[in-house]
Amino acid sequence: MGAGIAGAMTALHLARRGVRTRLIDRWEPGHSRASSTDYNRVIRAIHGRDEFYTRWARESILRWMELQAETGQKLYYQCGALILATAGHCDWEDATADTFTRMGVPFYRFSPDEIAVRFPQFDPTGISYALYEPEAGMIMAHRGVLTAIDLFRKAGGTVDRGHVMTDDKERLMLDGKPLEADLVVIATGPWMGEMYPRTIKPISRVVGVNVLYTSTPDGSTQFDQDNMPCWIDHGQGSFGIPSCEGSGVKAAVVIPDTIDLDKDERLIRRETLNRTRSYIRRRLPGLVGQQVVDSKFNQIALTPDTHFIVDWHPVHKNVLLAGGCSGHLYKHGPVFGDFVAGVGMRDYGTADRFKIAGRKKLSPKESPSGR
């Protein structure tokens, strides 16, 4: 249930294991309500001290490249990722550097002066240093979902439209009728909390992220993915992606926003427009005066520790809950789907970090997302 990246990749891996699989979503695959929507996503191994996600990210890059070679679809751009460490608040970046050193992940550390020379798009004011991961980059998000679903169909799977809900005992209903199957994987993203108000909602908070795309300057390639990396700027609550395939430069200042998933329109807030332009003036001065050419409203399901959810329902033993993206699941999609399929087929148990019970807030150094 759910045809975003988590559901699509899980369905694909189940089908490739020879399991007769049906993928159901309320809307057309790739629809704009999903957390997996938008043109692109950052893929990077940078996860603080967390070696688990670092390994998964490195493996996921290879898996995305394999899918790209298999299908001929351009899914991955290796433009690198730059992590800007704010002076006085560098715990997560310090921990990442230690993790990369232990695990042999290639990276560079740049001083503010070196940032200004190597990446002149950025004003390094207030930055202590930056970590640059050259093997990171971006995944084409919308294309990635549609590619996974196309491969799923070719593997013998079926894709259907339907509305899945639960009753007051959290039993599944499809279009108003009881849903029965040997295995049901619930990968409905932010809707999972509404479907499971007792089991999931206490550990899953839905927040909105407003994203702007700004035009690159006339005649300039400085802000294209060939010349500029993706970046994360925790001190400013921001992240971004260079222009790719004509998108414009993606920049987001994360202002946690509430949303009614079924009633609210996916429109950005005026406050976000002003905050993002203010950020661009400070950090990306070469974009000052350029027009906003596109915008997206994305929602994420945020868990207290920003770990994913992959666990069996405590009562309905054939229901496997898979999600809790916390803003960093998409890039792990191929590995996540393979893992969930294995748990669903009971080839192995889930990881302790993915269990529903025992969730707690982590410090920025411990958190895999730095949140």
Specify the residue positions occupied by each region the protein language model found.
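Predominantly flavin-linked oxidoreductase catalytic cores and closely associated redox partners
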Residues: 139-220
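C-terminal catalytic lobe of FAD-dependent flavoproteins
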Residues: 279-371
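Hydrophobic anchor at the start of a short beta-strand
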Residues: 21, 107, 184
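Flavin (FAD/FMN) cofactor-binding and adjacent substrate-gating region
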Residues: 66, 87-156, 160-161, 167, ...
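Dinucleotide-binding Rossmann-like beta1-alpha1 core, especially the glycine-rich loop
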Residues: 40-118, 237
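Glycine-rich FAD pyrophosphate-binding loop
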Residues: 15-36
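Active-site substrate-recognition segment that forms the wall
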Residues: 12-17, 74-76, 190-318
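Glycine-rich Rossmann-fold phosphate-binding loop(s) that bind the pyrophosphate
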Residues: 2-6
